[in-house]
Amino acid sequence: MGSRGQGFMLGCCLLLAVTWGPVLSLVPRVQEEQQEWEETEELTSPLDHVTRPEETHKRYSPSLREGLPTSRCYRCCDSNPPVYQTIPPPQINITILKGEKGDRGDRGLQGKYGKIGSTGPRGHIGPKGQKGSMGAPGDHCKSQYAAFSVGRKKALHSNDYFQPVVFDTEFVNLYNHFNMFTGKFYCYVPGIYFFSLNVHTWNQKETYLHIMKNEEEVVILYAQVSDRSIMQSQSLMLELREQDEVWVRLFKGERENAIFSDEFDTYITFSGYLVKPASEP
């Protein structure tokens, strides 16, 4: 090797010494600071894990950041922060807790009336009350009786119009409810009455009469033409109101119509009486 080769080797050695000298001098310092940082980390409580790694690195190795060359980057970081399991806050079941009884509140407003309920069962009979005082005298009661029975001793023949049968003999006429001049019974005591009519037919003539209530034909008494005369009767019950009229009517002369009687015997009778007054229950 010549002098040129030796000079080249010497230049290379000087270049290496200049370049790596500062770096090699920092290695012991980095190792000391790293050991010191590990000892400090062991003494740190678990809550320090939440500290940012950059702050920890700056705190424990400030000289390293200042001494390293600006052309290279060195970073020391902690491991990932621990994951803590989220525990839900405790809940209290207030339905099982019972507090002290409060004060009575104010009375509220009256509500609306409800619907009418069904009728309840009949109650027990109460005790008998005391006897009351005597009342004032009442009105005089009306007569609760009515009866009549009348007869006719003259024969009657039909003509061109209807004829009321008028009677000339009075057997019973209680309180004069039967009018002998008109031949009609007038009701003064409302109620139920019984009436009967008896006549004697005429030979070879028809017998045709009606028992009338006011102007209404109620029942008929009828006998056909016959060679022999006979007694014929009709009866019924009527419910009358006050001022109703009951009478006997002979049919008009479209056909030969007659009833027989004479002055020696009474062949025609008309009777009636009150069975039950309307005022009685």
Curated annotation (Swiss-Prot):
Molecular function terms, GO-annotated: collagen binding; identical protein binding
Superkingdom of this protein's organism: Eukaryota
Signal listed as a keyword: yes
Cited InterPro entries: C1q_dom, Cerebellin_Synaptic_Org, Collagen, Tumour_necrosis_fac-like_dom
Keywords noted in UniProt: Collagen, Glycoprotein, Secreted, Signal
Compositionally skewed regions (Basic and acidic residues) per UniProt: 49-58
Chain positions carrying an annotated carbohydrate: N93
Pfam families tied to this protein: C1q (PF00386), Collagen (PF01391)
Presence of keyword Transcription: no
Record's GO cellular component terms: collagen trimer; extracellular space; plasma membrane
Chain ranges of the C1q domain: 141-281
Subcellular location: Secreted
Main localization (coarse): secreted
Signal peptide: 1-25
Region Disordered: start-end pairs: 36-64, 107-136
Biological processes annotated in GO: negative regulation of platelet activation; negative regulation of platelet aggregation; positive regulation of aldosterone secretion; positive regulation of cytosolic calcium ion concentration; positive regulation of gene expression; positive regulation of MAPK cascade; positive regulation of phosphatidylinositol 3-kinase/protein kinase B signal transduction; regulation of glucose metabolic process
Sequence ranges assigned to domain Collagen-like in this UniProt record: 99-140
Protein name as annotated: Complement C1q tumor necrosis factor-related protein 1
